[in-house]
Amino acid sequence: MEKTITIGEREFKFKSSAATNILYKRAFKEDILVKLTEYTKYLKELKQLGAAFKELKNSEEKTEEEINIELTALMNSDAYVKTQNFSSDTLPKLAYIMFLEANENIKTIFTKLNEDYYLEWLMTVDQDELLTVTGEVMDIWQAGTKSHSKPKN
């Protein structure tokens, strides 16, 4: 799947293909599918923690100080930290791979599968604005994964 996303005032074209996962692994020495599985697990935990915190916040028995202690514990939880790391580290890397696929020829892609080119690209994008579109990047990647994972009859 291919889509253009506006980041700040610039438009960026992103593409997900059957090669996206392999290119990601080559560039960053990590398996994006493993990262996504971990993220999903931590996201579920975070939702449970959030629901527990909401109950705590609505409780009339707890003091404001106790609520703040619980909120701090939630924000320091492994689930919160891991989901934040996925959003701020893994998704921009995935966006970079999908940017290469949409904008570079095949031979050029292979020369740019490294941290240096990733950092160079990252310097051209506003970090906060990139983080606001990571959901769209995930949607493109998942749509590309689905379109390449259909069983053949």
Task: For the regions a language model picked out, list residue spans one by one.
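Short, surface-exposed, low-complexity cationic segments
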Residues: 18-38
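Subset-of-secretome marker
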Residues: 47-51
